[in-house]
Every structure is written in C-alpha cells, then in structure tokens.
Amino acid sequence: MQTTTVRASSLSGRFDCPAQWQAKNIDKISMPRSPRSLIGNAVHEGAAAYDASRVHATGLTINEAAGVAVDYILEKSCEVDWIDLSPKDVEAKTLQIHQRYCAEISPKFDFVIVEAACNSVNIEIDGINICLTGTPDRVYQDFAGDFGGLDLKTGFAAVSKDGEVETIKHIAQAGVYEIMLEQEYNIELREAFVIAGMSTAGQEPQIGLGMIPSAKAQLLGNPENDTKGLLHYAANILKSGMFYGNPRSMTCTKQYCPIFNSCKFRGKLS
C-alpha cells in the first residue's frame, strides 16, 4: 500500500497548488527562508516560552520570553533571503507582535499543553495510507472543563484591517491537529479550534481570534451519509498522481514556489 507522509501545515497547499506541494513535500526542493517567515517562527518561539511558563508557573515575564524570540532571530538570520525587510525590521516587528500576543491573547486562555509532542497518525483512505505529522501549538481548557486546540498564525494578511482573522485555509491543518491531539492525549476536543492571527503588515500589527468549529469532521467527512472530507480529496490527488499547477495561486511567486521558474503550468518549458 502506498504511504505518503503529510505534515499538517502543508495540507491546505495540496488543494491550492498540488504542483507546488509536490515540489516542496515529495521532491523535497528547499527554499531560502523569507524575513516574514522568520518573524512567524520567532514569535512562535517567544510565545511558547511565555505560555509554557504560565502552564508550569515558573514566572517568566513577557520581556524575558522576548529574549527567546530575539535569540532565535540571531540564530537563523543566516538562512534568510533578505528581500523586503532588514534584520532590524524583523526584530522590531517580532517584538511588537510578541508583546501583543502575550498581553492580549494569551491571558484569554487557560492552556494545558504547549507545543504538543504528538506521534504520527496513519489513516487509510481509498487504498492510500496517509501518515499525518505535525506539532500542535496549544490545547486550552474552558471553564466547563472542555478542551480545544489553538494555533498561532502570522503573516501579511493573517488579520484584516477590521480585525477579521482568516480561518478557511487553516481548516485542514486544524482538523489534523485535533485528530493527533485526541489520539496522543486521550482527550476529546469539543471546543472550536482557535486561530490566533497576528499580522506582520503595517506599523502597528493587527491581532485577532478566529474560530473553526468541527475541524476534524470537515477533514474526515461523515461515513453515515457518505459525505467526503478534505482528506478524501487529498487522497484522490495522491492516488491519481496528477499534481497539477495553479498559476493563479497567491503563492505562485518566486518567494514561495521552488519551481516557479520552471513550472509548465506557467508556460515554462523544461
């Protein structure tokens, strides 16, 4: 039986542009890190340090956790293609977002798991074994004792000017995380999956929260009425081997796609 490993964060890309997904995840063609992706990774590092301190009551301050983010930037700066932001810009933006996350988003949640270590999950669909992997950011618990997942998302368009957080493109990833968390920790995630959005655009970053209800159900579908889930469509693409391109994708740029200059779906002849 064919087995394909799929990282949760890459799953939505398979529907957006399968050709780009194949290049990155099957052919393993790497790309330089962008300044804005470095911001996102650094924010994750600093936020994780702060939230882990909250969970374990070790007393790390927001500013002390910011040091973790800055150290990460210094460590990874040599991997970045500095095209639109300088290292100074990246550090300043990272600290802005870090401060707002720790002061305005984190206190809204009672986290019980930070940077969850989960084993892979194998799901067989239509003769294809899909091995799901990933590291869920958070599990929170509400006042009634119910659990939910949360993921941090940064990016130029992560939050609109009116504070709306884009959630649609994160449904597949959220569904994978719910499956992995429930299997790893033997819990049921009844609450909506939360996207903590933080924009890297503008002088003052926008932040907000978006909710994804029933993410796992949207991923797996409903066998009782033969409703297909997103994972069934992903399996069909894998089974067919038809990794077609999408030249109208928002990520059809040199910055995001490793085959941009040779993609036949853009009229390039290899």
Regions found by a protein language model. Name each.
Residues 1-270:
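RecB-family 4Fe-4S metal-dependent nuclease core
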